[in-house]
Amino acid sequence: MTWFIDRRLNGKNKSMVNRQRFLRRYKAQIKQSISEAINKRSVTDVDSGESVSIPTEDISEPMFHQGRGGLRHRVHPGNDHFVQNDRIERPQGGGGGSGSGQGQASQDGEGQDEFVFQISKDEYLDLLFEDLALPNLKQNQQRQLTEYKTHRAGYTANGVPANISVVRSLQNSLARRTAMTAGKRRELHALEENLAIISNSEPAQLLEEERLRKEIAELRAKIERVPFIDTFDLRYKNYEKRPDPSSQAVMFCLMDVSGSMDQSTKDMAKRFYILLYLFLSRTYKNVEVVYIRHHTQAKEVDEHEFFYSQETGGTIVSSALKLMDEVVKERYNPAQWNIYAAQASDGDNWADDSPLCHEILAKKILPVVRYYSYIEITRRAHQTLWREYEHLQSTFDNFAMQHIRDQDDIYPVFRELFHKQNATAKD
């Protein structure tokens, strides 16, 4: 009997290669579908999988077919509407073709719905954050902060003699020799029993005894030819270098929770910060996040309180900037950390406080951070805070600001702020 052993690395997902090829081929259509779908999700459901739909015409495969020209004769059984040389037009109407449900009703016409398939959570997040990076990440400092330590990582079939594992190699040798000689040993045992019976019987069966002795000798020779150790048995201790946990960057999240921020505006701010958190945790291993909520007073909070606390009040934006400056001086030396900040507000601020925000950012924060992003979530006209920040944008290259009017703007603005083209290292 012949046995086939499937040694493919993705044996349990035999269509994985085809799936990955499909995702690469139609990446543009899939990313467009994802960017439309993310705005329809709830705040707590941003990181799950997604059903993606692609128009059928976008996934049509190239094919060989006869050209429209030339002379051809065909027989269509049961035809009573057309005669020779008539050209059959494609039916028009809402009955087929788009699958979008926007056409008019029709009694004829046919087509295909959009192609819909499910992508996993990992595929969804990979496509969601593709081509994004922390801007101005200081690569030379990142290498200084990253330390690698050697750790045992199982066994490997290749290696240097100094790393050979004698015990594991002998175990493999015993298993191989047992598997290769088990059948022969059973047959040898049966022949030896038959030989003992014949040798003790009367009259002696010399020819049969000679035949059995010959077969026994051949089986023993075959068993002895199985090598005690083979290169297939050898196993070496495997070692790999793993980065020693060390923080390389810190992100400050500053969210306005004043009374002027209605629930809809707060939800949009939370969506932005959830995207930011998923992006950081998905792309970078060692990034700390500092959460700061502010109204008239600022407070450093944990992740749960940042997203779910109901505390509110007036508006003094400078309180959050002062607290961030204090935390940086206390815990994050700019010479050793890549410092980032993302601020979200509706732009409503006490008028005399906006110039103070400009001063704190210009003199204390922007000189030490790698990148500072500000998003203003409002449908109203911009106020003094936006105008003060516009002066900063024209002066500092590491300051960016964007305007969000409604929920559909969140993901495009997020990609604009953290697009990989901006991720150039500073010397």
UniProtKB/Swiss-Prot annotation:
Region described as Disordered: 79-110
Signal peptide annotation: none
Ranges of compositional bias, category Basic and acidic residues: 79-90
Pfam families: DUF444
Start-end of Gly residues biased regions: 92-102
Family listed: Belongs to the UPF0229 family.
HAMAP family linked to this entry: UPF0229
Protein name: UPF0229 protein YeaH
